[in-house]
């Protein structure tokens, strides 16, 4: 048959065609693809084309802490295990879950899980290392960048065995209107 008709090529679908097939499967009663699966697949196909500025949450202006830096890492001030401590009050000022740690020039370095940090300091009553609650975000400065380009930069790797930072597991859109995109924002689309 190949000699008469030629080799049969694999037919690849354009993304728009795949989306239409999924929509039709979603609506068909006899389809093996249920509505939830189809919606997840459609969202998955769409997510890489969205501009990064369409995802995540705006950051509260009070969610930024500028700290001195030594050897590329922020130097956290000494703090007391008290709700009245000035540094802890700064971390809590916005009431938001995440705080951006920047250098003295305002360049972002890390994001801190403010809720986890404050809970540990105030209720565990043991020495708390702020770095244990910090993540190194993927910093993006172009709000039009497709989300798919930033997603591929998300990963976990420890730079050294003593490095407690979780690296590249959140995206920080660093513009005049900063936004934070976490894994839960991305999973919420699926």
Question: Whereabouts are the PLM-identified features?
Answer:
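Transmembrane alpha-helices and immediately adjacent membrane-cytoplasm interface residues
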Residues: 1-3
């Amino acid at each position: 048959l190949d000699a008469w008709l030629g080799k049969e090529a694999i037919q690849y679908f354009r993304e728009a065609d795949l989306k239409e097939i999924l929509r039709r499967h979603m609506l068909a009663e006899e389809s093996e693809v249920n509505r939830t699966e189809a919606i997840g697949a459609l969202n998955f196909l769409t997510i890489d084309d969205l501009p990064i500025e369409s995802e995540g949450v705006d950051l509260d202006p009070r969610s930024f802490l500028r700290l001195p830096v030594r050897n590329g890492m922020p130097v956290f001030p000494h703090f007391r295990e008290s709700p009245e401590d000035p540094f802890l009050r700064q971390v809590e000022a916005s009431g938001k879950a995440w705080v951006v740690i920047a250098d003295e020039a305002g360049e972002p370095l890390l994001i801190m899980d403010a809720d986890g940090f404050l809970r540990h300091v105030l209720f565990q009553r043991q020495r708390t290392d702020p770095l244990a609650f910090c993540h190194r975000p993927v910093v993006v400065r172009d709000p039009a960048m497709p989300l798919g380009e930033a997603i591929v930069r998300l990963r976990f790797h420890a730079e050294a065995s003593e490095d407690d930072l979780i690296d590249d597991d959140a995206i920080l859109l660093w513009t005049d209107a900063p936004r934070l995109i976490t894994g839960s924002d991305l999973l919420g689309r699926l």
